[in-house]
C-alpha cells in the first residue's frame, strides 16, 4: 500500500532540494533518516521531517509495518518564483529570483 505526504512552498531552490532527495530514493525509511541526519545541507531537515511524517501516516493511519516501509517515490516540483529587485548603480535594478519548492514523497510496504 502506498502512502503519500506533501510539503508545499518550502523556500529552498528545487535544484538544491533535488541533491538531497536523490540520496534517499528507493531506500528503506530507517536508512533514509540516517542518511538525512548525516547530510550537511539546509534542505535535509525539511526532507527528513517529511519522510518521518509519511512514515507516521503509514503506521498510525493505515496500520503498515514500519520496518517494511521504503521510499517508493520522491520528487521536487518548482512553484512560482518570487521576483525581487536589487538596486544597482546609475538607477538600474537587477532582478533576484527567490525560488521555492513543493516536495512529494510516497512510501510503500511493497504490497498492493
Swiss-Prot record:
The keyword Ligase does not apply. GO terms for cellular component: cytosolic large ribosomal subunit. CDD domains: Ribosomal_L22. InterPro entries: Ribosomal_uL22, Ribosomal_uL22_bac/chlpt-type, Ribosomal_uL22_bac/org-type, Ribosomal_uL22_CS, Ribosomal_uL22_sf. One of its GO terms (molecular function) is rRNA binding. Pfam families: Ribosomal_L22. Keywords: Ribonucleoprotein, Ribosomal protein, RNA-binding, rRNA-binding. The keyword Ribosomal protein applies. GO terms for biological process: translation. It comes from the Bacteria. Part of the 50S ribosomal subunit. Belongs to the universal ribosomal protein uL22 family. PANTHER family: CHLOROPLAST 50S RIBOSOMAL PROTEIN L22-RELATED, LARGE RIBOSOMAL SUBUNIT PROTEIN UL22M. This protein binds specifically to 23S rRNA; its binding is stimulated by other ribosomal proteins, e.g. L4, L17, and L20. It is important during the early stages of 50S assembly. It makes multiple contacts with different domains of the 23S rRNA in the assembled 50S subunit and ribosome. This is Large ribosomal subunit protein uL22. The gene is rplV.
Amino acid at each position: 500500500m502506498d502512502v503519500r505526504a506533501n510539503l508545499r512552498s518550502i523556500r529552498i531552490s528545487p535544484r538544491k532540494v533535488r541533491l538531497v532527495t536523490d540520496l534517499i530514493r528507493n531506500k528503506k525509511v530507517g536508512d533514509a533518516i540516517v542518511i538525512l541526519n548525516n547530510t550537511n545541507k539546509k534542505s535535509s531537515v525539511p526532507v527528513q521531517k517529511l519522510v518521518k511524517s509519511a512514515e507516521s501516516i503509514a503506521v498510525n493511519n493505515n496500520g503498515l509495518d514500519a520496518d517494511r516501509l521504503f521510499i517508493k517515490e520522491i520528487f521536487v516540483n518548482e512553484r512560482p518564483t518570487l521576483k525581487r529587485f536589487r538596486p544597482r548603480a546609475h538607477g538600474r535594478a537587477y532582478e533576484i529570483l527567490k525560488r521555492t519548492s513543493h516536495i512529494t514523497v510516497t512510501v510503500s510496504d511493497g504490497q498492493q
